[in-house]
Amino acid sequence: MNRTVSTLSSTVSDVSVEIPSICNVINTELPTSDVYLYTLKLILLDYINEPRFKEAALLSNRTGTSRVLSDKTNHQQTQHGKKLVVDKQDDMSERDIVQATLRILKGKLAQISGNKNLAPNEMHWKSIVKMYYSMLDSSSADTFSKMGQMEEVVGYFTNIASNELKKMTIKNSRDELFSEVAYFIDLVIDVLPDSCANIIKRLLDYKINLKKGETTVKKKRAASPATVPQYRSISGSTISNKQPSFKVQDISHMKYFMQLFETDETKLHQDVMAVKDDCTNPIFCGELRYLRKKIKKDNGTLTASDFSSDREYNLWKNYELLEIANLMDRFEIGEKVTSHGNRLIPKDAKSVFVRLIGLVLKKECSNAVNAINLSQEALFFFHKSARYWRIEYPSTISSLVYSAANLSVLGDEELNIPITENLFSVIRNKYLCSEDNLDPSAWNAQDRYLWAANLFHTTDQSMRTINNLLTAIFSGTKPKFSPVLSFYYSNIVGDPVMEFYETQSVAVKKYWIKLFKKTLFKASEDYFVSLLQDMLKANAIEIQNVQNLVETIIEAIKAIQKRYNKPLLDEISLPRQCAVFLCEVYGSDSLNLIKTAEKSTMKMTGQKLGPIDALDMYDVLKELRQIYLQVKPKGKFFFNLENYFIKYLTRLCDDVSRNVQKVIKSSLESENWQPVNDQDHFSRSVLDIFKMINESTSMLEKFGWQNEFQLAQMITVILKAFSDGMLSYSAQLMELIQRDLQEGDEPSYSLESSDTRSSLSLNNANVNHEKSRSSRLFEDLKNVVKSTPKMVAPAPYQFKKRTCVLLNDLDKTLFLLESFEEKADPSKISSVIAQYHSSHNLEDNGKSFDDQNMKQVYTLRIIGAENIKGFSKTGLSNTYVSMRNITLQREIGTTKIVARSITPKWDEEFVFESPFGKSNDIMFTIWHHPHSRLKNLAEDDLCGKANMKFTPRKLKDDGFPIDFSLTLNPQGTLYCQISLESEKIDAVSSMGRIYRSFSRSRDRAINLIVNKFSDFIAFAFSRTTLKTVCGHHGSALASDEAVYDAILPLFDYLNANLNILASELSQRLLFMVMLRAWNLVLENADLLLLPALNSAKVNILRSAKKSLWENTLSTTKTVSGYGRPLTQAEIEAVFKWLDALCVDFFHNKGEGPPLAELKNEYYQNILLIPAFYDKSVSELKDEVQRLIPLYEEYLRWFYLKKTPITFTNKSAGTISRKKSLVANIVKEPKEQLERDAEVMNIILRILIAKGQHDYVHRILHDRKELVNTMKNRRAVSRAVTPTGKKGRN
């Protein structure tokens, strides 16, 4: 019989282990008539033995003595505990009686200690408490175990009471001591049975002697019979010998009995008359003797096998024998009847008792819901039935009362915590008074089994209660499991008896865990259905309705998670289980609901569902998926959210891309080019644009898209649109800057003669000249000055405020781009896409788009030219290069003008775009810009031109620069570099394009600004200015004051221009302008100090054109295009100017750029000139010969050993590459070889100044051959082992 609980209605069929059941012990099908009959006989037996029917004579002749004290009432017995039961005093030694009495007395003292009201007064109570603690003290255990006489117990208490009284000040302490000892003796006598008459007699004598004032106890082994007072009625008169009438009205407890069994008086009277003859003392005593006989033969209701030890069995056996003897003392009147027919004591006494007590409890609790309040009538049936039917052993009656409650008032399916707790309290306080009885695991097997069966019944109720609470898990008011669980763990799991049934407990728990999960699933299903029904009440299902449904589900899960943070029964995580079930219930309909909402939107509005609404739906579904995967890691969500909602993300991305360019365009149209505030000098459009792009990317990130590749693609598209818009923005800013700098008057310069003080003003006659052509003033100044003039600083150029705002915008954009890059991380985006393509064997993302919509970007670098045609009297030209795309019929750009040179160096970059795969024919033209006043309105002169066709098939699409040179017509060579990059839908490429565009624009704008006062810098560092200091021949020794006075106008002029800029530019930009101006100063000083290195070739060519006679007549050591070498005095004057400008003007005690940036590499190279300038030609040549091998080693390092350019990952194309790929090559630390090469160049230039043109030309020719050799070797090396990777892959 596999049962899990004790009631017939609560069974678990799938538990394979046998579960203790009340039905296995108690006959729950017992007819009520049997209970009725035995209970009626019990009442009648007690009725005929009431004191009013007793004769006023000595009690039992068998014992030869009787107690002086009358039996305590039933209420008193209940209040103070059980009596010791001894059949005959001779059956047990007095020592055994004393030890048994101490055990029962201990429980009685415990009750009094816990309730002060049970003691006569506080003094008595304190002594009782002290005695009780002494009995608990392990150190006193040996003393109590050795006690063999009751007088020893009384004497021990006397000492305790005496010691307590000594602590207090009491007048009659002697009388108080006697009173307390007498009270204690009464407690002991109350425990002893009538069969212990000798011991009781001695205690009574001791008590009488106390009243007489005696202080010693006389120990007597024998005692004469004591007289017993007559029983008196309530009125105090002596009871006469009455006979029972057996009338219902005369029988005690009959009214309660009729209510208990719902019978009428007539029928009851008939039943009384029918059974009264069976309710006699002889019959009852005969049945008691039969029970005693069976117990003595070890064949009673319990046997030794039911106990854990013989000692425990003997304790029970002695207890029963003593109690039976006690009953026989009361009921036996001399007549003996042999009876074992169970006429008074039921054969199945336990089942009858349980049914009876069940009826009593139902009646008593009919008006009380949360407590068991027993009346005196009820207590009569509790205790009389247990005593007369011999089931009053503490463990037995406890388990039976528990069973009766479970089969009656606690018979509901769910747990009644208040009544159950009250029941446990009644059992502990009334039946398990002694601590030895409180542990059910120490009980006999039958009682332990029945107790366990009741616990399983309560377990079943607890589990059903929890199961019912689980049905309300999704309600607004969350169910509270803690009261049930607290009761369950403290009273059931914590009960020691459950250790004997651990297997059964595990099986039951497993069953209920399984059932709980089913209940949770059903609750989740019902909850979702209710939500769905609410949603379907609307006319149409909209996406917002579906989103609200999912949000409600998420909130419900979170509410459960917040409320229940501990597993139910340490097994079920309610938040996890509810989340799994609720998600799975919703998941089966999730996609259909979304599709229905999409169709509904199309039907109502005629348009597709908006991307924002759809992505909001994705957001909540993503959160639900995250919850589901957290609670079920190995689970699979119901459909791929990203693959379904990607169409909406794509639409949103397209909208954002269009909006990006729209915002940039509108920002330009509404811009007034005014600073944002006094501290920030840039305009509002910069902030608006970056606010827009940050919000755009943040909006995508806000959705938390879980497909990294898809998100990277979308951001890439937005960055491409951003790149296109920003390139347009950069171009328009640069156009405005050029327009501003082209407008306005050119500055006019004045020279005052030292003799006449007359001044000459030279103004620009054509203020609207072409934007790329600079002032023609320098040659005019040089031709006009006929004496030693004094230079006067002109008025500063009036830069427009708008120009400065535009420049600030360019710089601020670069700064914000760096911040945006850290946030957007384009390198990671590109890497994600590349890894996806690699893992899926797809082509490069940039090539997956239609080539017709893509562009190719050419970066053209104009480096310099050689041997171009000269136009001035000195054979020099003021040259610039213009470039035009003949294929697209579009101007590419124009370089700055390099004055007075046939070997100009421009080193400028230009970018142009072309349709993908289209060749471009570029026309390069070098012009001479004359400064002559007579040609102000004339066209510029042509120095040379050349064509070059760039075909994408012949250029590597990797962004690496390729050197090429063009032979000019009619003469000269132009040196350039070209690099090609194909436009790609790539984050790194897009950001790199923006940065390079703005970086180039900013640098070009700075150059244009600095060029506005470049002519005066060139004039200040000229031979004309030197003549004012050192004379026409450079031999005059001028004072330091004269040297500094000569350059002072330049100080004033630069200061005036920079002050204008300082008020409108940021410090960062101002320093950049100052450093560019300083480099311009160094360039002019360098040209003044030494002839250019390529002038050796020019002089050789010109010498070859002269006749022998002309060369012989030329006695002056002049260099073509440079003039005579400077004297030592002139050299010193120039370096004094440089030092003054560097330290006093530009650095200005830390107010300007740092000295480390001012004393740059260029400056350090110029400082080499004085070290070699005064050396002889032979010494210089020897130094050159020493350096030639080092220069060869330098070339091998530069072309073959230098770290090759490779771009991978983040370095591939991020905005940190600055201007362009070629300009962003990682520079190696400057090594000694490179330094030696610079030294060699300086020495060669000095040799040119000393007239060693042939020697220098030969050295340069050998170096050129060596360079070509190294380039060829590098080309071969790269062909064998490619090192240049694509810049953005």
Swiss-Prot record:
Residues 1044-1184 form the MHD2 domain. Residues 748-762 have a biased composition (Low complexity). The keyword Cytoplasm applies. Keywords: Cytoplasm. Residues 745-774 are annotated as: Disordered. Residues 615-733 form the MHD1 domain. It holds the Pfam family C2. InterPro entries: C2_dom, C2_domain_sf, Glucose_resp_signaling, Munc13_1, Munc13_dom-2. GO terms for cellular component: cytoplasm. It is found in: Cytoplasm. Present with 300 molecules/cell in log phase SD medium. This is Uncharacterized protein YOR296W. It comes from Saccharomyces cerevisiae (strain ATCC 204508 / S288c) (Baker's yeast).
